Amino acid sequence: MKRQFEDVTRIVIKIGTSSLVLPTGKINLEKIDQLAFVISSLMNKGKEVILVSSGAMGFGLDILKMEKRPTNLAKQQAVSSVGQVAMMSLYSQIFAHYQTNVSQILLTRDVVVFPESLANVTNAFESLISLGIVPIVNENDAVSVDEMDHATKFGDNDRLSAVVAGITKADLLIMLSDIDGLFDKNPTIYEDAQLRSHVAVITQEIIASAGGAGSKFGTGGMLSKIQSAQMVFENKGQMVLMNGANPRDILRVLEGQPLGTWFKQIEEVTHD
């Protein structure tokens, strides 16, 4: 099945902490610059782009000179709060080099659950996009809670990006990660693991093969990416999971090159 993205106008791009923060804990400035260039190029071609960006914790750890993520929730929220400001400041500066304006939208799950607040945030997205601004979305870590009686967390930004793609009716979700896509088995263990180029149905076998948590700076593992693809399918959308090592590969993907894994349901043909 050939990839055809000519009709794609609205794109949600999700970038994870592992793509923004080097293994040393330092910020990957080159990667952020490349990402800003690619998004600005797409905007200049008439595309509408929303960026879902992790990284608040990684930025916070770097600024506060902390080597590892705190185990205490209040400290985690404090570090993320510091990091979010630094991350947005850097995004704003770098995007400005490409004459692109950005905005910040911080979400919690209850915002998209209640109809009134969902309508408000949907209108905010539409207004920003109509003004040629790139909304940069993250979860509001400083106030999100994950308690049984009042859970407001999305879980991680993989799922958040699928939610954003749904509420903005995006044509395509591109998920950048530190892996090349979805394999038939764990490529870090099995040398003969094969990359799945196209997934039309998310089977129990695929779900079972997706195990393990994320990086030390982030939270999302392969399972959350599969769950995100399921959410995208529920909204009749499509998603590409690809390596974020070179953000310019986004342009190649949109040209139809078979990078990463394309999650796209096969439409049933009805005969009269």
From Swiss-Prot:
One of its GO terms (molecular function) is glutamate 5-kinase activity. ATP binds at K14, S177, D178, T219, G220, G221, M222, L223, S224, K225. One of its GO terms (cellular component) is cytosol. It is an enzyme of class 2 (transferase). Pathway: Amino-acid biosynthesis; L-proline biosynthesis; L-glutamate 5-semialdehyde from L-glutamate: step 1/2. It holds the Pfam family AA_kinase. It comes from the Bacteria. It catalyses: L-glutamate + ATP = L-glutamyl 5-phosphate + ADP. Keywords: Amino-acid biosynthesis, ATP-binding, Cytoplasm, Kinase, Nucleotide-binding, Proline biosynthesis, Transferase. Its EC number is 2.7.2.11. It is found in: Cytoplasm. InterPro entries: AceGlu_kinase-like_sf, Asp/Glu/Uridylate_kinase, G5K_ProB, Glu/AcGlu_kinase, Glu_5kinase, Glu_5kinase/COase_Synthase, Glutamate_5-kinase_CS. GO terms for biological process: L-proline biosynthetic process. Substrate binds at S54, D141, N157. CDD domains: AAK_G5K_ProB (cd04242). Its main location: cytoplasm. Catalyzes the transfer of a phosphate group to glutamate to form L-glutamate 5-phosphate. PANTHER family: GLUTAMATE 5-KINASE, ISOPENTENYL PHOSPHATE KINASE. Belongs to the glutamate 5-kinase family. This is Glutamate 5-kinase. It comes from Streptococcus pyogenes serotype M28 (strain MGAS6180). The gene is proB.
